[in-house]
Amino acid sequence: TSGVNMADNIMVGSLGENALSAVALANQFINIYQFSCMGLGQGASIMTSRFWGMKNEKALKQTIAITTRICLVLGILFTVITWCFPEIIMKIFISEPAVISQGVSYLKVLSVSCILMGLSLAYSNVYRSVGNAKWPLFSSIGAFFLNIGCNYIFIFGKFGAPELGVTGAALGTLIARIFEFVFICMYLIFFDKKIGFRIHDIFMKCQNLMKEYVQISIPVVISD
């Protein structure tokens, strides 16, 4: 997942220092959200691995439901902030107008991917906790190479596509995040039989596990 952002940084380097600085600084803000969701997912994986070993299917689903709700709320919050205040975000890191302008364009497009990325990160940790490390691996590899391909097309205007520069890098990342989300989340919710989590399980009563989840996850988020 981090490789997607890294690919953006590398591929916009040929556009000049302003473009490279804009993408690198914008990704610093996105990384705050990314590491938060990774921490939530890791906290969830501590609990899901235990419940998986205990064969406690209900508690396993409750933990995933809690993680889903928190990631959705956090994702919506970051989406709104990134979409509505990209210029303020960029000014936190730099005062150069040319860099800020390109960073705003990048963040505007990338804001749409926040919710998708958060859920993908969290569910990937859940998969690993129940012994399925291959699915997140395939998802990350696919998203990485899809992002490189889309970046090449949209940054440099190949195969008849418009030359979008920094905005093209953000568009490539958005497409990669959509792929990652469909690969990880849609499979878990609609096709997976190992965990058996479905959309209606998101609304399960989970008060009995909420305190434990917070106690485990918050320290992980802070340390990340």
Range-by-range predicted roles:
Residues 82, 125, 151, 155, ...:
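Structural signal for membrane-spanning alpha-helices in multi-pass inner-membrane proteins
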Residues 32-35, 147-151, 181-185:
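Hydrophobic transmembrane alpha-helices of multi-pass small-molecule transporters
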Residues 17-28, 103-107, 170:
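Small-residue hotspots at the loop-to-helix junctions and early N-terminal turns
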Residues 3-21, 90-97, 153-164, 221:
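Helix-terminus/linker motif at the lipid-water interface of multi-pass membrane proteins
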Residues 2, 35, 75, 79, ...:
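Residue-level hotspots within the lipid-embedded alpha helices of multi-pass solute transporters
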Residues 48-115, 161-218:
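Short alpha-helical transmembrane segments in multi-pass integral membrane proteins
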Residues 6, 20-83, 117-131, 135-136:
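Small-residue-rich hydrophobic transmembrane alpha-helices
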Residues 71, 126-153, 167-174:
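Alpha-helical transmembrane segments of multi-pass membrane transporters/permeases
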